[in-house]
């Protein structure tokens, strides 16, 4: 999608997710087997901070007015995680999948996704790894700069 406003991209993700749910619901009601589509959105965002449902707004070290003055936006989202930053130059991937087509163990899914990212980065000569106790793919594990991560 290129460089896109976070809210616009979020709305698009919600639309794709709703389509998957509608197909699954119709399949159950009408005893059909129409397959659901899987999507991978790749994009960049303007400066944005998100707060996941397991996060704490106290972890945002500046107020929203400061963010606005810097051209950044802030969004509370219904996904896991804490405070996450996205911005220009950072490629973000959003898989919108029906996990029933794969496996329903979210932790297994996340480990497979991390491994796919690690192997893809390796193809481009970039070394990355998991960080114990954290979800995501990281460059320079142990470095305090979270900007060096892939979530």
Predicted regions and their residues:
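N-terminal lobe of the biotin/lipoate ligase/transferase fold
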Residues: 1-146
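Catalytic cores of processing enzymes, dominated by hydrolases/peptidases
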Residues: 147-151
């Amino acid at each position: 999608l290129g460089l896109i406003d976070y809210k616009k991209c979020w709305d698009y993700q919600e639309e794709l997710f709703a389509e998957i749910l509608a197909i699954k619901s119709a399949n159950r009601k009408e005893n059909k087997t129409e397959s659901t589509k899987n999507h991978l959105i790749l994009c960049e965002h303007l400066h944005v901070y998100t707060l996941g449902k397991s996060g704490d707004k106290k972890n945002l070290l500046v107020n929203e007015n400061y963010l606005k003055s810097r051209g950044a936006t802030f969004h509370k989202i219904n996904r896991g995680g804490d405070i996450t930053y996205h911005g220009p130059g950072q490629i973000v991937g959003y898989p919108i999948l029906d996990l029933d087509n794969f496996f329903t163990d979210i932790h297994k899914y996340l480990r497979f996704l991390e491994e796919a990212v690690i192997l893809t980065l390796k193809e481009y000569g970039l070394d990355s790894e998991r960080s114990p106790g954290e979800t995501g793919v990281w460059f320079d594990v142990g470095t305090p700069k979270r900007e060096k991560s892939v979530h």
